[in-house]
């Protein structure tokens, strides 16, 4: 696959940009916490980062269809590089929030154009291998990014990590600059972007409301965003405050995130074999029970236990994600898939924004151990209940019987 020059350049650009984003997942919370020492402000920064994705989810895909995708990617990379290079020089929370929001806008606009460009440079028969290579690379980046950030931060501070992130975006821009995409004939737009977005949102919402599988998966993924929030906000405070490891907090937090990502990557690699043995419903069930691994935090276990819990959480989370994505793809007609994915992404991102806001408020009041345990119990037990209440489990069983 990498022998195809255009795909190789696009793949390298994806790799570099994703590495930059992975570095920021560790560096951003550390920068905010070092500056403010506040869980509420840390949660608020991530709310601000996520809200642009909620607004742009249905529009960004249409921009990728109407505008030159190469120019979108190049502009997004250069803009993000310039913005994150400013972060080490900020001294106020509102400055970080503004830059974080603008970078999030760039991420939201670039992603659909990036996905849409892959089929343009790969023959139809090689699309699955191309996507597989991209997925494996993304899994590796999720491990390397936090580990790299940990190394930089351990030696210096969070600031230089953003310089490294800016370099990643510049490398991505260099790859895109040399990329040539084939010309695409686009039909003239018959409606304004706003009207088209309203129509697509309506179509997507109808499917989410009326299809029990899509409805259930959307609801449980929104609930799962609480886990994402505690991994960023609460785990950092657990290390810095509960374990009283302020001097080593940056390094340990980075390594914990890398451990979770390693679990996700390894879980993805073995998911297919596990599915063949136990079936997809059990694969997804085990994945959605994974947050129960956060409950041991209530007794403040030693660090090795926390590392093990996060590894298992990531390992089984990958099973839930893979099973969920497969069910989602099978439940939605191809003609509606783009609109449903856009609506689903917007809904889950909205859940993420609410989750970060709630966890930022809850963590200093309950304390990190109790917050981790509470979220683990609520999501680990509540996820399967949500799937049952929404009719998702019954619909999956009917489909399994019909397909037998």
What are these regions (language model features)?
Residues 15, 23-27, 156-163, 206-268, ...:
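A single, central transmembrane helix in multi-pass transporters
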